[in-house]
Amino acid sequence: YDICACLVGSEMCIRDSPTGRLNIQRMERLCKTLSDLKNAGHEIILVSSGAIAMGFGKLNLRERPHDMPTKQASAAVGQCELMYVYDKLFTEYNHTVAQLLITAPDIADGGSRKANFHNTMDRLLELGALPVINENDTVSTEEIAVGDNDTLSAIVAATVSADLLVLLSDIDGLYDGDPRKNPDAKLIPTVETVDERIIALGGGSGSSLGTGGMATKLLAAQIAVGAGCEMVIANGEKPELLYDIVAGKPIGTRFLVKR
């Protein structure tokens, strides 16, 4: 894979507690693994959630905010902290990070904004930088209300013609039933076509820290695969699994591109 995009859900960055504090060990392992993959010749793009969750931790709020102004204030504080952490960790491995905060209209249309984003991304990769992308949560209301870095990451992957998109969250992959209700539900290792039957499996599994569930991940798969980009849904508890995912090994659920 030449260009690999990786989405990190909020639950990857933040400890699953009311405090919204950073999961330092997991973030360190993630950045080390991505740095090593970059050293091995893969272009890496990171789409990272976690600004709101990190912000309410830093603001010492007792729980995730529910009203829009507090969410957006949390995002403003948390985004600084998030980038500080990524900059610090990637710098240890001699990689330079670049922050890109975008909203859906920036990359949704075929106009000059999308072309501008594409050109900037191309140049950053040429210069050897590692782009870290998030929705611009302080001005973007729809994303926070609906919660959709899954779709954002797929649009980014499609825009830059990525070869692989990996969605890391607290979900192991796509199951043929709800594993929380049905212990016999089986993981589906590969999906060749994201059809109505597959979409129907995307009920509504979500995590407490983030805002996206399986339904948005399947929408992301449609966008990515439609643009010729393979996609994998995997559990990010062990970021080192990225080595096996990039090597094509059966981890999580892989959505294949028709060649």
Region annotations inferred by a language model:
Residues 1-9, 14:
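Single conserved hydrophobic/aromatic residue that forms the stacking wall/gate
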Residues 240-259:
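Active-site loop ensemble at the mouth of alpha/beta enzyme cores that anchors a bound cofactor
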Residues 158-184, 230-241:
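Acidic, metal-binding active-site segment of PIN/NYN-like and related structure-specific nucleases
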Residues 20-35:
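Short catalytic helix/loop segments, enriched in acidic residues and glycine
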Residues 51-68:
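Glycine-rich loop at the start of a catalytic domain that most often binds anionic cofactors/ligands
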Residues 43-55, 98-99, 132-134, 167-171, ...:
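Short beta-strand segments at enzyme active-site cores
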Residues 64-140:
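Ligand-binding beta-strand-loop-alpha-helix segment within the catalytic cores
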Residues 121, 133-155, 186-242:
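Polyanion-binding loop/helix "lid" in catalytic or ligand-binding cores
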